[in-house]
């Protein structure tokens, strides 16, 4: 089966000087969190889970 030919927009290449990957755009809605805050929150979450495991081990006995 032959597909109908459609025109596609040419692929664009970012030729700007900023080669750092953008995690969010300025126009996007929602919470804008930097990588340092994400790392800090994930470490807090891991510590909280470890504390819950330790508390569960001692309260079950």
Swiss-Prot record:
The protein, known as: Protein transport protein Sec61 subunit beta
Places the protein is found: Endoplasmic reticulum membrane
Domain of life per record: Eukaryota
Keyword Cell membrane assigned: no
Positions in the Cytoplasmic compartment: 1-35
Keywords: Endoplasmic reticulum, Membrane, Protein transport, Translocation, Transmembrane, Transmembrane helix, Transport
GO cellular component terms, A-Z: membrane; Sec61 translocon complex
Subunit structure: The SEC61 channel-forming translocon complex.
Entry GO MF terms: guanyl-nucleotide exchange factor activity
Bilayer-spanning residue ranges: 36-56
Record keyword rRNA-binding present: no
Function, in words: Component of SEC61 channel-forming translocon complex that mediates transport of signal peptide-containing precursor polypeptides across the endoplasmic reticulum (ER). Forms a ribosome receptor and a gated pore in the ER membrane, both functions required for cotranslational translocation of nascent polypeptides.
A Pfam cross-reference name: Sec61_beta
Parts of the chain on the Extracellular side: 57-61
Cross-referenced InterPro entries: Sec61-beta/Sbh (IPR030671), SecG/Sec61-beta/Sbh (IPR016482)
Membrane topology: Single-pass membrane protein
Similarity remark: Belongs to the SEC61-beta family.
């Amino acid at each position: 089966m032959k597909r109908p030919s459609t025109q596609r927009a040419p692929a664009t290449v970012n030729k700007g000087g900023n080669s750092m990957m953008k995690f969010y755009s300025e126009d996007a809605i929602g919470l804008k969190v930097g990588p340092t805050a994400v790392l800090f929150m994930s470490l807090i979450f891991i510590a909280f889970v470890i504390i819950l495991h330790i508390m569960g081990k001692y309260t079950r006995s």
